[in-house]
Design a protein with these regions (language model features):
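Catalytic-domain carbohydrate-binding cleft regions of carbohydrate-active enzymes
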Residues: 1-186
Length: 186
């Protein structure tokens, strides 16, 4: 439905096609934007300031394929003395990897299973090539997080509300006929 606002010589009215009752708060202080914000703070309280590091530079790209690649980016920023407050691990659980998703953090490369065909059968081809690069220096998700923190940065893992048809969640929800009828990625 629609809501209407009218302000004329007879007065100010607000009406709604669907609402039968509404509560309105009119905020006015001294006619300035700061005055309006002051009036809102009187009603809601003052918002807490975010920590300073949240307002700094955050490095994000489509994805980092390994913990070593992510750590290498942090290293390069530090080497070049470029300020870096956070780094984002994005979307590696997408696609065919049934072991890395919103529920499981078990990419075969991270948990030293790259030589196990059961763990790598759905692994994208570009990640299979990593087998030849030797042992990773960071051998677990915990080590990666500690490394980023030790180098004075924060880590954010981007989780999208999506999962591929190879994941355990997808198969379980499909059996229950509990999936919404639209395509997810991939």
């Amino acid at each position: 439905g629609k809501s209407y606002y009218e302000d004329n010589e007879q007065g100010t009215t607000m009406t709604s096609e669907v609402g039968t009752c509404a509560d309105y708060y009119f905020m006015y202080d001294d006619g300035s934007q700061d005055g309006v914000i002051s009036a809102i703070r009187t009603l809601t309280g003052q918002a807490t300031m975010f920590p300073l590091w949240t307002m700094g530079y955050w490095q994000c790209r489509e994805r980092y394929k390994t913990s070593d690649e992510l750590a290498g980016v942090v290293d390069k920023f530090r080497e070049l003395q470029i300020p870096l407050d956070g780094i984002v691990q994005d979307w590696q659980y997408w696609g065919c990897d049934s072991n890395w998703n919103a529920m499981k953090f078990q990419n075969p490369y991270y948990i030293n299973k790259v030589n196990d065909p059961a763990w790598t059968k759905y692994m994208p081809e570009d990640l299979k090539k990593l087998k030849t690069q030797g042992e990773p220096r960071l051998k677990s998700p915990e080590e990666m997080v500690k490394y980023v923190h030790k180098n004075d940065a924060h880590l954010m893992i981007s989780i999208w509300a999506s999962f591929g048809p190879w994941t355990d969640q997808y198969r379980e929800l499909k059996k229950m006929n509990a999936l919404l009828p639209f395509e997810t990625w991939p």
